């Protein structure tokens, strides 16, 4: 065996050397070459993420400081909040009654001191050194339930052991959830009385499944049968972490326990509302909202004797002025009074005057030119304007069906959606015309889905006159549209922010009264104190209206929130509403926006990116949309509930959502599609007919681009003859089955019919889900027949 190894020959090539200049360099080489200079990527990363430029110890110190600040804020809130914890008790299904449930809680501890007020049941619990106030609104009164939840710290649901909810319970849960939820505690009365452990766990899991289905809470359910269970429940109500609503975190509010009238002068008086001061520090310069009546000014806030003390005091404290308004308080001006003379008046030119003299008038036979000059034509002008408004603002109903006769106003209102499904289904005196009107609405919605925005060109008047307010766009996405062009007179009455985001940021930064030295801002030590709020210039009728109100909640307004503007809301149609909802000026909706309730007309538009948005003639079923109304300014986020109401006062939940912004410059464009038929096709040259019916209209709309459903693009070359045929040219050859389309656009605005809504709701005014579904099936059968 040879002991010598292999030796390379003379033809052996050496290994390639490592090329350090190719590929990635080491960190050390990069650092030495940069000499402290940072690249573009590093600069961009540092601008968006500051924690990358600091050390690990510095980041750890920042987290510790933020954690300590949160703990200090929590301790400050506990130290300064002296108001009792408000708990709203809502019973679902056939469970225990709220009053019986509260009576059992009162018997779990002998030291509990129970007092009552017109709106609450109050517990003073020396064992826990705390106070709890219970609200028991009637679940059949939706307004009462929502008002109680807006002011509550905890929402306590009493679930039935069967875990079965009625249609009304599901409807109520939907409204409550859309309105916003505070901290939730779920209680099952009778759960502890089940002896069989397996059966008890099955009941618990069934109820927890229903709770998770509604996405209410993950804390589980609690029994409320024994003394131990009730004590544990009271402890949880006191010590659980409170999650305030956005409404409560931004606005100072008060649950009114006593209402009095003082300094009565004529039809107005000074309203004295007594209750606990809750939320951020009260400011006497800010306005206060009275539900159903509007916004009013505050003169002063005084401390009063607490009617539900934790410990009885022998000495009665004297009344003390907590805050007093000054010359900086907000006024109650909600809109601007427009000046009709504030505008440029352009005098007509000589050519326009000569053209006006050539105007032809219809006069009786045998009338001379001198007599014809004295005939007034105001009525003709009004008729022409009315017909134009009917065509533009009522979805071109006259254009869509020329043979349809003019209907009375009652029928038009029924088409606008003011007849609820429950009225159709369950009234004994049912009217066949109303049924057919509902079927007609379904047909129109189906036609709009199949041929969106398509309109027949009128034959009795020129198209350039019928669509004189419309214009063509080269591209809906990229073409420009001036938001300040051709604004209605109502825009002179509203307010607009120069920069909405900056204004909102400044307003939110001042929440809580940073100017503590001002006499108009209450000190933090008075948070939760029982006080009297003096509201000036309130009509005397308000006291009579609130005589029977149990859950009256006052909210203070932020700056600018009393001013009228254009409010945009992102909504989604509720599944329980299956009837078509049109977007026209005859349909008014009831909106619950935060603590406000008002009626207004809305314009529906698409919720898409861009600077222009397409009008939705019908409320979309599956996707979200934006409703635009004239309403007081409300800073987002804020919850929105949308209802529709018939002439008998019955209401139906239509849509839910939140506030988008307050922007009058939002451009909502109504699209009208004119369709024609390709008469002769010669490769890319096509003769189109039935789109227009005279030569002048073809020349007028010649600059507008044409298209087909298959994606072909073209333009008008010239008119052929005098009966509306025109020669067109497209980018590719057309099929005989294609239709030629032309898009026209017009900006639309909502109608100014804002009014404060001041009626309490009841279950007879709501349409339950099962009834609506059955009615939709009946209407579908009627359409198929």
Curated annotation (Swiss-Prot):
Location(s), subcellular: Nucleus, Nucleolus
Record keywords, A-Z: Nucleus, Ribosome biogenesis
Chief location: nucleus
Skewed-composition ranges (Basic and acidic residues): 26-40
UniProt-listed GO biological process terms: endonucleolytic cleavage of tricistronic rRNA transcript (SSU-rRNA, 5.8S rRNA, LSU-rRNA); maturation of SSU-rRNA from tricistronic rRNA transcript (SSU-rRNA, 5.8S rRNA, LSU-rRNA)
Entry function: Required during maturation of the 40S ribosomal subunit in the nucleolus.
Name recorded for this polypeptide: Pre-rRNA-processing protein TSR1 homolog
Organism: Caenorhabditis elegans
The encoding gene: tag-151
């Amino acid at each position: 065996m040879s002991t010598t190894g292999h030796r390379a020959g003379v033809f052996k090539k050496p290994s390639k050397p490592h090329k350090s200049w190719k590929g990635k360099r080491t960190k050390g080489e990069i650092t030495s070459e940069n000499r402290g200079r940072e690249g573009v990527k590093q600069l961009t990363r540092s601008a968006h993420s500051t924690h990358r430029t600091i050390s690990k110890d510095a980041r750890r110190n920042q987290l510790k400081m933020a954690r300590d600040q949160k703990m200090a804020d929590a301790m400050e809130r506990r130290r300064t909040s002296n108001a009792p914890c408000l708990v709203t008790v809502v019973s679902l299904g056939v469970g225990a009654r709220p009053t019986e449930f509260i009576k059992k809680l009162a018997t779990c501890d002998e030291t509990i001191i129970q007092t009552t007020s017109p709106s609450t049941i109050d517990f003073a619990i020396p064992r826990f050194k705390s106070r709890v106030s219970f609200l028991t609104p009637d679940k059949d009164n939706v307004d009462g339930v929502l008002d109680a939840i807006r002011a509550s710290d905890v929402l306590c649901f009493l679930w039935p052991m069967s875990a079965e909810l009625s249609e009304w319970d599901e409807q109520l849960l939907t409204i409550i959830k859309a309105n916003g939820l505070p901290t939730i505690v779920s209680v099952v009365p009778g759960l502890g009385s089940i002896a069989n452990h397996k059966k008890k766990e099955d009941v618990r899991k069934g109820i927890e499944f229903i709770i998770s289905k509604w996405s209410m809470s993950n804390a589980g359910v609690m029994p409320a049968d024994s003394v131990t269970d009730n004590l544990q429940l009271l402890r949880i109500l006191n010590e659980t972490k409170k999650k305030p609503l956005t409404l409560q975190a931004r606005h100072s509010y008060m649950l009114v326990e006593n209402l009095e009238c003082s300094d009565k002068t004529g039809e107005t008086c000074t309203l004295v509302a007594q209750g606990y001061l809750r939320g951020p520090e009260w400011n006497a310069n800010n306005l206060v909202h009275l539900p159903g009546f509007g916004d009013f000014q505050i003169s002063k806030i005084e401390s009063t004797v607490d009617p539900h003390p934790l410990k009885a005091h022998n000495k009665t404290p004297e009344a003390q002025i907590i805050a007093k308004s000054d010359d900086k308080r907000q006024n109650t001006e909600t809109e601007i009074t427009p000046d009709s003379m504030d505008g440029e008046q352009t005098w007509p030119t000589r050519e326009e005057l000569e053209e006006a003299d050539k105007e032809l008038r219809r006069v009786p036979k045998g009338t001379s030119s001198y007599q014809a000059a004295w005939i007034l034509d105001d009525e003709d002008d009004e008729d022409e304007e009315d017909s134009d408004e009917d065509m533009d603002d009522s979805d071109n109903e006259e254009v869509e069906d020329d043979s349809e006769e003019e209907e009375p106003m009652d029928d038009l209102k029924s088409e606008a959606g003011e007849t609820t499904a429950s009225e159709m289904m369950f009234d004994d005196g049912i009217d066949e015309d109303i049924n057919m009107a509902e079927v007609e609405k379904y047909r129109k919605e189906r036609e709009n889905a199949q041929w969106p925005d398509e309109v027949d060109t009128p034959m009795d008047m020129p198209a350039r006159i019928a669509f004189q307010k419309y214009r063509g766009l080269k591209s809906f996405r990229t073409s420009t549209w001036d938001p300040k062009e051709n604004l209605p007179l109502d825009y002179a009455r509203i307010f607009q922010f120069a920069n909405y985001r900056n204004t909102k940021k400044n307003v939110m930064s001042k929440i809580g009264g940073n100017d503590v030295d001002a006499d108009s801002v209450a000190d933090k030590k008075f948070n939760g104190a029982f006080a009297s709020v003096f509201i000036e210039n309130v009509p005397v009728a308000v006291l009579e209206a609130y005589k029977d109100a149990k859950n009256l909640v006052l909210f203070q307004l932020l700056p600018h929130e009393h001013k009228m503007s254009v409010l945009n809301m992102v909504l989604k149609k509720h599944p329980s509403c299956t009837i078509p909802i049109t977007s026209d000026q005859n349909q008014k909706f009831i909106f619950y926006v935060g603590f406000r309730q008002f009626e207004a007309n809305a314009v529906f538009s698409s919720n898409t990116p861009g600077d222009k948005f397409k009008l939705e003639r019908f409320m979309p079923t599956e996707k979200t949309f934006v409703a635009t109304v004239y309403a007081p300014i409300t800073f987002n986020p804020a919850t929105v509930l949308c209802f529709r109401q018939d002439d008998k006062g019955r209401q139906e939940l239509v849509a839910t959502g939140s506030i988008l912004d307050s922007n009058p410059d939002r451009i909502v464009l109504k699209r009208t599609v004119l369709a024609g038929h390709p008469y002769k096709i010669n490769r890319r040259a096509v003769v189109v007919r039935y789109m227009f019916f005279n030569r002048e209209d073809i020349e007028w709309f010649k600059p507008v681009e044409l298209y087909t459903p298959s994606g072909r693009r073209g333009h008008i070359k010239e008119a052929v003859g005098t009966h509306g045929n025109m020669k067109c040219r497209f980018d590719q050859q057309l099929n005989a089955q294609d239709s030629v389309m032309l898009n026209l656009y017009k900006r639309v605005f909502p109608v100014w019919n804002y009014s404060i809504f001041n009626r309490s709701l009841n279950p007879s005014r709501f349409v339950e889900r099962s009834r609506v579904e059955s009615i939709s099936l009946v209407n579908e059968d009627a359409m198929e027949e």
